[in-house]
Amino acid sequence: MALSPGANLVFHEDPKMTPSPPSCGAPGLGSGTIPQPHPDMAQVPMLNLLPSPGLALVPDLNDSLSPVSGEASGLVSENTPRPDDSRAIAPASLQITSSCSGEALDLDSKDVSRPDSQGRLCPASNPILSPSSTEAPRLSSGNHPQSNSEDAFKCLSSKIFKLGQRNSNPSRHELNPFIRHHSREGLVLGHCISRPSSKALLIPTSNSSLDLDSNPLLNMGSRNTSKLNLNVAPDSHGTLIPDTNETITLASHNISESVSKGAFSTTWSTSSKETMNVASSGHSRSDLSVTITQASYVTLIPGSSYGISLHSSTHEPNSTISPPSCMTLILGSNETLSLDSSLLFSDTSTLTLSSQQDDAKDNSIHTVPLEENLESWSEMASIKVGQFPLGFPISNPAGKDAVTLQGIPEGAFDEVTSCLVKVPEKTEGGNNMALVENVTTLQKSQDLLEAEGEKKTMIKKIMRQIQEEPLDSLSSSVRKQAMEILTQLSHTQPTLGMRERSELVNVCVHSVFSLPSVQAMQEKDEAKAETIQALYHQTLEALQTLLKALFIEDPTPAGLKSILEALGPWMNSGKAHERARAVNTNVSVLNHMLLTLPFFMPLGFPALGLLLGRLILHIGDPDEEIGCEALDGIIILYTILELQKRARDKEETNKKELYESNKHFLGPYNPVSPCQNILRVIEEFGDFLGPQQIKDLLLAALEGLKGSSEAPGKDSREMMQLASEVMLSSVLEWYRHRALEVIPEIMQGIYMQLSHIQEPRARQVALLPVSLLASSFMTEVVVALLMCPLPLNSNGAEMWRQLILCKPSCDVRDLLDLLLGSLKEKPVTKEGRASIVPLAAASGLCELLSVNSCMGRVRRIYPQLLLALLIQVHYHIGLNLPGCVAPPKDTKKGAQPSPFVPVRWVVKVVKTLLLRMGCSYETTFLEDQGGWELMEQVESHHRGVALLARAMVQYSCQELCRILYLLIPLLERGDEKHRITATAFFVELLQMEQVRRIPEEYSLGRMAEGLSHHDPIMKVLSIRGLVILARRSEKTAKVKALLPSMVKGLKNMDGMLVVEAVHNLKAVFKGRDQKLMDSAVYVEMLQILLPHFSDAREVVRSSCINLYGKVVQKLRAPRTQAMEEQLVSTLVPLLLTMQEGNSKVSQKCVKTLLRCSYFMAWELPKRAYSRKPWDNQQQTVAKICKCLVNTHRDSAFIFLSQSLEYAKNSRASLRKCSVMFIGSLVPCMESIMTEDRLNEVKAALDNLRHDPEASVCIYAAQVQDHILASCWQNSWLPHGNSWVCYSATTHRWSPSCENLPTSHQRRSWIMQALGSWKMSLKK
C-alpha cells in the first residue's frame, strides 16, 4: 500500500444516531482507474503495537472462520460449502487494504481486472455478499467488467488476506483467542478509495447498527468521479439506493462525489489542504465497513461510547454484533507508506491491524480496544525503523474491555509517524460537530521512558497471572495465551533489560516445566485426556516460541546466556519429564538459531561450553529419548559452529547438507554405550574449545553429580556418574593445557559444587580434576586452593588432601615448598590490604599433616615451618581478614558458634605441627602454663614464644640445633614482629650447650646491641639473653659490666616489662662479689620501680613494691645522700598504697616499709606500719604527718606533691586516703607553707569536692574546713586570700563558729566572711 504525504482522512462518529432497518446489499462507488502510486515509496518493516499498562487477557469467544484456499474466509457465497451451513459476518470495521501480494498492478490502465480460476476477469473492486444473498448490487462510476460476487471472491481469495476473523474449522484446534492464524485467502470488504493524495473525513454514527446480513460498502474512485446519491430504502434490508434529493458535493481537484443523507447522512467537503470532512446527522449502521487504499494521511475520529467486543464475526447468522464501531487495517505484503505518512486514530472502539506476506503460513492480528475517553490517553509511541514498533498506549481501567496485541510480519509499514488526536464532542442545533484539538506528533527521536514503563508494567501483570496458575494441573489455556502475548510484546520497543528478561524467562519456564508429566495429568482427569495432551503441546510450543522471540530481541551473548541459565537447572532434574522438557527446549532454541544464523554470526556463540557440557552429559541419560535428542542438539550446535567458521572464511555452505553430514559424522546415537558418543563429541569439538569453554565443560559435568531428593534409581545415578567421569577425564586428558588460565575458576567451581554432592563415589569423581590438574600445574592449583574461603570446611579440606591421596599424586616436596613460601608472606600487603594467603597456607598445611605419608617430607622442613607459623601468629594478632566467616553452628540446637579468630587458627596449626612431630610434652607444658593464650596477645606474644622455646629446651627436642642455626640469620631479617618472635625463641636457646660453638658476636654481641633498641620488648629480651649468658662463668663479668646499661634501659617502660626485666636481673645481683657492685645501680633501679607503685595493674604494683624491698636489702652502708633521698621519697607512696584495701599489696608495702626503716633507722609511729583504715583514726594520720615533717622537714613539700598526685589516682580508695593525708599534712607545714602551695592544695580540694565517689567529696569538704580552721587558729592565712572568699561562696558544709578562738571572733573581716558563707549554704 502506498500512501502519499499530506493526505488526511478523518472519521467522526455520532453517538446519537439511531439504528436503521437491516440491509443485505453492499453498493459500491468507484472508478475503474487506479492512479499511479507516489514515486517516493519504500518497503516498510513489520508493525507492532505497544500496550498500555492496564491491558488484560480477553476470554475466548469460541467463534472462528475456516480458511479455504481459493475462497474468501468470512462471508461465504452459495457455492462455498461449510460444515455447519452457518454464515459469518465480517466485523464492523474500517479496512485499509492495498493491492494483492505477489501480483503486479497495471497502474496506468483504466480497467483493472483479474482472471479467476475459470478464466474470467475479476474487477479490482470487491463486492461483498451477505449470507442471505448470492450477489451484491454494485454501483460504479468506472468501466469495470461485470462479474458476480462469486467471481469477485475467487479473484481475491488468494491475494488479499484479512486478520480479525477466526477459524471455525472443527478439525483445527483452537489457538489463542487473541492470535488468529489464517491462510493467504482473505476477504476485502468494500471497494477502494485509491486517490493517492486525497484526504477525507468520514463521520459514521455511533449508536447505529446494521443487520448481520448486511455489509454496506463505500467505494470512491480517484479519476472521473461522478455525483451519486444513495438512500436506504425501508424495505431494502440495508441496500443503498441512489437518491438525488439531498446531496452534498465533495470536490478536491478533480474529485467530485456526493452521498445522500439517506445512506450515511454525511456531508463531504474538502479544504485547501485536501482534507475531506463528512458530517453525520442521519441514521446509519454500526456494521459499517469501509476499505481505503493508498491514503497517506488517515485520521479516524468516531464518537463511540459503547463497549467493545473483541471479534465481530460469529457463527450464528442472526446474532447481533456488539461493537458500535471498530476499525480494521488490512495491508498486503508489497505495500508501502511514504516517509511523511502518518496515521491518526481517535476515539475508536476497536483497532485491528493485519498484514501477511505471500509465503507466510499464518496471519497475524493486532486488535486494540480503544478507550472512549481520550483525555486518559497520555502518549503514543512512534514507529522506529528497523525495530518495527507502532505503539498505541491506551488507558484500560479495571472493568473495561481488554486489549490483545499481535505481531505484524516484516514489511508491513515503513517510517510512519503516529499521532494522538483529542476530540471533544460538541452539539449545536441538533447537529453533531467534532472538534479536533491538541494533536501531538511523536517522531523517531521520541522519549521512550514512559513507554518502557508501560511495557514493563504489562509484562509484570502477565507474569503475575502466569504465576497464579496451578503447578499441579493444566486446566486452562491461560499460560499459552499469556506467553503468546509476551511473544508479541517482545517485538515492541523498548527492549527489556537483562534482569527483566531473566525474570520473565524464569517465570515462564518454571510455570511450564513444573507441571506433572502428561501421563500423570491425564490419569488425574481421564475425561479430558486428549484435551490435556493437546493443550500441553500447545503450551510448550508457546514457551519455545517466546524463548525464540526473546532470543531474536536480544541476539547477544548475554541474551542467549539468560535463556540457557534458566534452562540449566531443569536439565539436571531428577524427574525424567522435566529433563526432557529442558533438553527439548534447548534443542528448539538451537534449531531456531541455526535458521537465523547469518544474523547472529558476528557475535559468535556464547556459553558454548556450558550448553555443550549439559547436552553431552545427557547423552548418557537413563531415558534414551532424552539422550537421542541431546545428541541431535549437539549436532545442530556443531553445525552452527561450522557455519560460523566457514562464514569467517567466506565459504558458502548449504545448511541442510552440512547438518546431514554432521549427523552422519557424530551419530548415530548408541543407547547401549553412550560413552562412545560422548568421547566422539568431545574429540570433534576440540577446535571450538577455548579456556572458558573447557571450564564450562568441567563445571557442567559436575552438575550431573548433584544429588536430588527425587533422583532416579541406583543404575540411573551410576550412568550419570559414568558420563560425568568420562567427560571430565577425557576433557582434561586431551585439553588440559588449555585450562591453565582458568584453573582458579575451576577450583572455585569444584569447591561450590561439592556442597551439593553427598554420595562418596560422586565426590570422588568431582575431585578428579584437582589431582589431574595438579599433576601438570602444581603451582596454579595450590594458588587457587589458597583462595578457598576460611576457615576450611570439609570440602576445602578434602580438596587439599586430594593433592596427595589420589593418583596421579603431586610431589609432596614441591607442595610443601609452595606452602612454606606462602607462610613467609605477610598477611598485610604494602598497600595496607589484608591477604588470606598465609592463613590459607597454614590451613592447607594442617590438612596435609593428617596424611601419614607426608610426615617424612614435613620433618625435612620442620624448623622452617615452625618458625614461619610462629611469626604468622604474631602477624595475625588482632587482624581481621576478608572472606573469613564463622564456622557452621554446632550440632546442639541454639548453640552460638564461636567467632572465627585468625590468630587462634594459626595457633591450632602450630599445635598440630608439634604433635605430629612428637612434641607432646612441650604442648602439654604450654597448656599448663597458659602459653597458647600468651602467644595470642600482642603484649605477651614474646612470652608465649619464649615459653615454648623454654619447654623445648627443657624436654630436649631433637630439632633444637637446626632451629638454633636457622634463627641466627633470621634475627636481622624482616620487620619488628618478625624480629621479636625470632629473638624470643633464640634467647631461650642460649641455654643450650651448643651455644658455646656460636661466635660471641652472634650471642653476647647481639644481646648487647639489643639494649639500645628502640622497642622496649627487644630491650627486655636482650636483658633476658644477657642474664642467661651470665650463668656461664666466662661471660659473667662481661654481662655485669653491662648491668648499668640494662637498668638504664628500663626507664619509661611499661610496668609489666619492668617487672619481667627486674626478675631477670635479680639473678645477676646474686653472687660472691655483690658487695663490690656500685650502689648507684641500685639507686637507679629503685628510681625505676617507684613510679609503678601506683600502676593500675595489681600484679605490677605488687611485684614492683616487692622488688623494691629486695633491692633495699641489697643496699649497704655507708648511706649516701642519693640513697636517703630515694628512700625518703618512698614513704608517702608506701603509706598511701597500704590504705588501698588490697591485702596482698598492703602486705608487700608493710614489708618494704620495714626494710626501708631498718636501713634508714627511722623511728616512725607504730601505727604507720598498720594496715587498718584511716577513716576513724584522724589522730594517727596527724601523728604520722607530724613525724614526717619534723624528721624530714626538707622533704615536706615532696610529701605534699606526692599526696596531691595520689589524689588524682583512678582508684577511689587512694584518692580518699590522700585527701585525709593532705588534711593532716598541711597544718603541720604552717611555718613553711607558701601561698602558691596553699592555692594548689585549695584547687585540688575543690576538684575533689565534685568527685564521683561520695566519700571522697565528704572528706575533701572536711579537710578544707579543717585547713581553714587551722589557718585561723594559727593566724598564718594571708589577708585578702582568695581561699576565704571562694570558700564563703561555694562551700557546702558549715563549720562550727562556736569552736573558733575568741581572739578571732573580734576580727570583722573573718566574721563577715563566715556570715556570707552561712548565707550561701542556706540558699
UniProtKB/Swiss-Prot annotation:
HEAT repeats lie at residues 957-995, 1036-1074, 1079-1117, 1125-1162. It is found in: Membrane. The keyword Transmembrane helix applies. Changing residue 183 to Y: In a breast cancer sample; somatic mutation. Glycans are attached at residues 318, 438, 586. It is a multi-pass membrane protein. Residues 127-150 have a biased composition (Polar residues). One of its GO terms (cellular component) is extracellular space. Pfam families: HEAT_Maestro, HEAT_Maestro_2, HEAT_MROH2B_C. Residues 1-42, 66-87, 106-150 are annotated as: Disordered. InterPro entries: ARM-like, ARM-type_fold, HEAT_Maestro, HEAT_MROH2B-like, Maestro-like_HEAT, Maestro_heat-like_prot. The chain crosses the membrane at residues 593-613, 767-787. Gene3D superfamilies: Leucine-rich Repeat Variant. Its main location: membrane. Keywords: Glycoprotein, Membrane, Repeat, Transmembrane, Transmembrane helix. This is Maestro heat-like repeat-containing protein family member 7. The lineage of its organism: Eukaryota, Metazoa, Chordata, Craniata, Vertebrata.
